[in-house]
Amino acid sequence: MKNFRLSEKEVKTLAKRIPTPFLVASLDKVEENYQFMRRHLPRAGVFYAMKANPTPEILSLLAGLGSHFDVASAGEMEILHELGVDGSQMIYANPVKDARGLKAAADYNVRRFTFDDPSEIDKMAKAVPGADVLVRIAVRNNKALVDLNTKFGAPVEEALDLLKAAQDAGLHAMGICFHVGSQSLSTAAYEEALLVARRLFDEAEEMGMHLTDLDIGGGFPVPDAKGLNVDLAAMMEAINKQIDRLFPDTAVWTEPGRYMCGTAVNLVTSVIGTKTRGEQPWYILDEGIYGCFSGIMYDHWTYPLHCFGKGNKKPSTFGGPSCDGIDVLYRDFMAPELKIGDKVLVTEMGSYTSVSATRFNGFYLAPTIIFEDQPEYAARLTEDDDVKKKAAV
C-alpha cells in the first residue's frame, strides 16, 4: 500500500495558512488501512487501540466503519462515549485497572476485560459483577520492536487457574488474549501464540470451562526511516489461515494501533535556527523530542524526514526547540543546505507521536488538521482526474 505523503507544493501552501508545527491526517488512508486488514484478516474483528492516536475524527471514522475499540482508562472511555460509541463496542484491555477506570466501565456498560494477575479478580468482581474476562498470557517474540511481555501477561501454566478463579468470583471466563509486541516482523510469533492458545482452550474444556473468544492483540508493522521489508498481506493471510485451522468456531479479534494510523499522518515543521558544531551543520526545528518526536525516546522509532532544499547533501544534525540537550532528533542525516523558515516534512507520524507529546518549556502542542477538509485535498483529486484523463487518451 502507498503511504500518505504530502507533496512539496501541498506542504508550502498549507504552511502559508497554518503556523508550524502541525500534523496532517488523511482519513482516506486510515480507511484504506482498515479495509486492507478486513480483507486480508477477515476472521479477526477489529478493536482499534485508540492509545495510538485518539484524534476524534479518526475515532468517528473507524466507528462508522464498524470498528470496536481497545481502551486503557476512564479517559479513553469518556472520549468514545462523547462520540456516541456504546460500551458494548469497547474492551478494557489494560491488565491493571484503577478504581476510576472500573467505575467508568460500569457507568458506560463496558463488559469485556483482560487481566493477568489474581489481584485484578476481586476488583473486577466488585465493580462489574458478571463481566466477561480474558486472561492475558505472556508470549515470546524476539522480533518485536517493543517488548510488551516483560510487564504484561501471565505465565501460560497459570492462565487456566486464573480463569477458574475469575469464574468462581462470579465473572464469566470468556477466553484468552495475547500481544506479541509492537512492530512485530514475524508471523511465526503469532502462529506460536495461536498454538499455545489452542492448547489452553482444549484444557479449559476439560476443566468444564467453555471458552468462546480469542484476542490476538496488535503488533502489525508499519514502515520507518530504516525501511521495512514485510509483506503485510501475506502476513495477515498466514495468520488468518492459522485461525481458520485452529479456531474455526471461535470469535477472534485483533487490536491494531500503530498499523491503523502510523502511515496516515504527516508532520510539517520549520527550521527556526541554524548553527555549525564540529564542522557539521545543525538545524533546529520547531518540533522536538518533547513533542511529536516523543516516539524516538518512548517508542525506539525513527521517522522518515524529507527536506526540500536544493544543492549537495551533507551529514547534518537536526534538533528540537527545547533547552534540553537531549532534544536531538537526527545525527549525520544527509540533507541539503537549509535556512531559517524552510519547511521540513516528516512522514509515518500517525501513531504514538502527538498522543505522548508534552508542553515542556511551554511550547504549544502541534494541532492535527484533516487533509480531506483542506483545499489541497480537492486540488489533489482534480490533478489525479486530469492524469487519468490524459492516460485514457
From Swiss-Prot:
UniProt keyword terms in alphabetical order: Decarboxylase, Lyase, Polyamine biosynthesis, Putrescine biosynthesis, Pyridoxal phosphate, Spermidine biosynthesis
Record bears the keyword Protein biosynthesis: no
UniProt GO molecular function: lysine decarboxylase activity; ornithine decarboxylase activity
Effect on the protein of changing residue 52 to C: No change in substrate specificity
Family recorded in the similarity comment: Belongs to the Orn/Lys/Arg decarboxylase class-II family.
Protein source organism: Selenomonas ruminantium
Function, in words: Decarboxylates both L-lysine and L-ornithine with similar catalytic efficiency.
Descriptive protein name: Lysine/ornithine decarboxylase
Functional pathway: Amine and polyamine biosynthesis; putrescine biosynthesis via L-ornithine pathway; putrescine from L-ornithine: step 1/1
Any one GO BP annotation for this protein: putrescine biosynthetic process from arginine, via ornithine
